[in-house]
């Protein structure tokens, strides 16, 4: 995470350019592998991370652009949650970390969105790429899932692109750090290429290095001797000399 001033400045510029209405920015929920308690490794929505910095699931940011009120909505940990995860910061503590003044429950978020819609206010939101989030937005906005993305805010899309296209010194430092890790990964790949001689083993080595560095791949690694096949998944067939 960056300093909370960074997130405050990003949100301030966002609301300044949108001028009026309500901004709805949902984070992501866990995605189960084969049952609810066995989720895939969590990856937060990038736009939510950009404006909130919180890499935990089930949070939503709502900003009343006209009044400037920012509220982080999300669940408090139950006893069952604490048994699995240990004590974690409260919702209010998380909001404070990123400079958000108010925090409330998901139920109150639904009421706030419904009140905005009833008052015929513009609700700005981004297009959704996750089916579960499409359904959530469908229920919130009272439109069919097929029409949710049709109502996405073009002004919000343009503003997010405008902001995220310009990198601060802190962001550039993070990009350079990632490039340094990429260099290490390619050097390791060349070092082990003849010794391992199959894509699965090489992918495992590289994924281990990424995880040990506190990172993970944005998409599955493409390691193949058949460059004519796009997005070929690693297999254990030996490379031909």
Located regions from the model:
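Alpha-helix boundary/capping detector
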Residues: 98-99, 200-208, 232-236
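A broad detector of the eukaryotic-type serine/threonine protein kinase catalytic domain
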Residues: 161, 187-191, 228
């Amino acid at each position: 995470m960056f300093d909370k001033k960074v997130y405050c400045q990003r949100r301030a510029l966002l609301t300044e350019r949108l001028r009026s209405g309500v901004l709805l920015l949902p984070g992501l929920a866990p995605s189960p592998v084969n049952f609810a308690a066995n989720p895939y490794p969590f990856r937060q929505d990038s736009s939510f991370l950009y404006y909130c910095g919180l890499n935990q699931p089930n949070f939503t940011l709502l900003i009343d652009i006209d009044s400037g009120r920012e509220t982080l909505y999300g669940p408090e940990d139950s006893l069952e949650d604490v048994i699995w995860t240990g004590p974690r910061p409260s919702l209010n503590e998380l909001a404070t970390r990123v400079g958000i003044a108010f925090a409330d429950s998901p139920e109150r978020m639904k009421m706030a969105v419904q009140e905005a819609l009833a008052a015929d206010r513009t609700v700005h939101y981004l297009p959704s790429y996750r089916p579960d989030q499409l359904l959530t937005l469908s229920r919130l906005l009272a439109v069919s899932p097929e029409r949710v993305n049709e109502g996405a805010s073009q002004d919000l899309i343009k503003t997010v692109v405008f902001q995220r296209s310009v990198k601060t010194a802190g962001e550039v430092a993070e990009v350079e750090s990632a490039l340094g890790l990429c260099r290490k990964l390619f050097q390791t790949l060349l070092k082990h290429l003849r010794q391992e001689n199959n894509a699965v083993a090489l992918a495992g080595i590289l994924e281990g290095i990424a995880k040990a560095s506190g990172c993970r791949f944005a998409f599955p690694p493409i390691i193949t001797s058949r460059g004519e096949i796009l997005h070929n998944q690693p297999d254990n067939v030996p490379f031909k000399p």
